Amino acid sequence: MTRTAIEIPENVSAEVSNLALTVEGPNGSVTRTLWYPSVTVSVDEDADADAVVIETDETDAKTSATVGTFESHVSNMIHGVTDGWSYEMEVYYAHFPMQVSVEGDEVIIENFLGEKASRRTPIRGDTNVQIDGEMVTLTGPSKEDVGQTAADIEQLTRVTDKDTRIFQDGVYITQKPQQGGA
């Protein structure tokens, strides 16, 4: 039997309903479905401290690994609603000055390599995009949404059919959240 308890800080609340865990805190809320056969996720409201409990009766390696994965997901959710996740990106161009802007729930890149048409990608979830000159900062409570938005922006400016040693224009991730949840 494998059992793991992740303590919930005072300013954070957690709730499980229909296999979905919702964690709410000062920076917003994150909901994620945590389902695997014979693995249960529950909120233990003990007198000392609340905790998210992940447990299973199985002893095989795959189920134990899933418990560890769920533990990481819950820790990331708690970190996201308390401190948030942040990515930093840098706009780099040598040939044509490109403009990056936010319009509604889309990031728009204009004049990339002199193109007439603008390139667009959606902003995922509750991700907040701030543009300050050549720096783009993405923040939000969901690690997956912030990371995928950063990856989408980076892929949007991928150079194809040209020598990438010469054409290095693009928007590149310069700083990611460090492993270990910080």
Curated annotation (Swiss-Prot):
It comes from Haloquadratum walsbyi (strain DSM 16790 / HBSQ001). GO terms for biological process: cytoplasmic translation. This is Large ribosomal subunit protein uL6. It holds the Pfam family Ribosomal_L6. Part of the 50S ribosomal subunit. Disulfide bonds: none annotated. This protein binds to the 23S rRNA, and is important in its secondary structure. It is located near the subunit interface in the base of the L7/L12 stalk, and near the tRNA binding site of the peptidyltransferase center. Keywords: Ribonucleoprotein, Ribosomal protein, RNA-binding, rRNA-binding. The keyword Cytoplasm does not apply. GO terms for cellular component: cytosolic large ribosomal subunit. GO terms for molecular function: rRNA binding; structural constituent of ribosome. Belongs to the universal ribosomal protein uL6 family.
